[in-house]
Amino acid sequence: MPASSPGHMGGSVREPALSVALWLSWGAVLGAVTCAVALLIQQTELQSLRREVSRLQRSGGPSQKQGERPWQSLWEQSPDVLEAWKDGAKSRRRRAVLTQKHKKKHSVLHLVPVNITSKADSDVTEVMWQPVLRRGRGLEAQGDIVRVWDTGIYLLYSQVLFHDVTFTMGQVVSREGQGRRETLFRCIRSMPSDPDRAYNSCYSAGVFHLHQGDIITVKIPRANAKLSLSPHGTFLGFVKL
């Protein structure tokens, strides 16, 4: 078999290489054209969207006509839903107003003792009070009495810490007003005979309808009663409900 010449073998090798190069070139050109077309399409769509947004901004909305309220179409489509929404909004506003009024009506007064006075002729010891917590103007402490300025339902609480060897001690909380005097509540405690152990507290509480002008007093039905003047041992308080 005759041997091939060197020139013929070189031409055969160069022809496939040239074909590959041509295919790669055409592929690159085709890819570039495709990218350019895609960019043109995207640019066209973007310009179209910008024109649409500009038109909507000038017209005020996609379907809003001149003089038409924004909620009109929704009202026409689902009036029951909007009616329920309006009712809920009104209910929330009413609750907010009632809450504000309710908060304004609250009065609080907490009193602690500053001194005691004893009336030997009536066998009574009275406590002189001072406020340590006060909110509102419905109540006012005046010496040994508390005056009610605002009619309403009140939580009333009272405690006296005794240090006395008298066999029984207690407190009486009374109201005077509208031409009569009445006892709201009373508390009685037995006392130890040993002076070192003669401590006992008397606590009472209740809910009462107090009227403007009522006078509230706390009395210990013993002359020269011995009791604690500490704010955590003896106190008197009112909370309007």
UniProtKB/Swiss-Prot annotation:
Residues 1-95 form a propeptide. The soluble form derives from the membrane form by proteolytic processing. SUPFAM superfamilies: TNF-like. Signal peptide: none annotated. GO terms for molecular function: cytokine activity; tumor necrosis factor receptor binding. The record marks R95, A96 as: Cleavage. Glycans are attached at N115. It comes from the Eukaryota. Homotrimer. This is Tumor necrosis factor ligand superfamily member 13. It comes from Mus musculus. The gene is Tnfsf13.
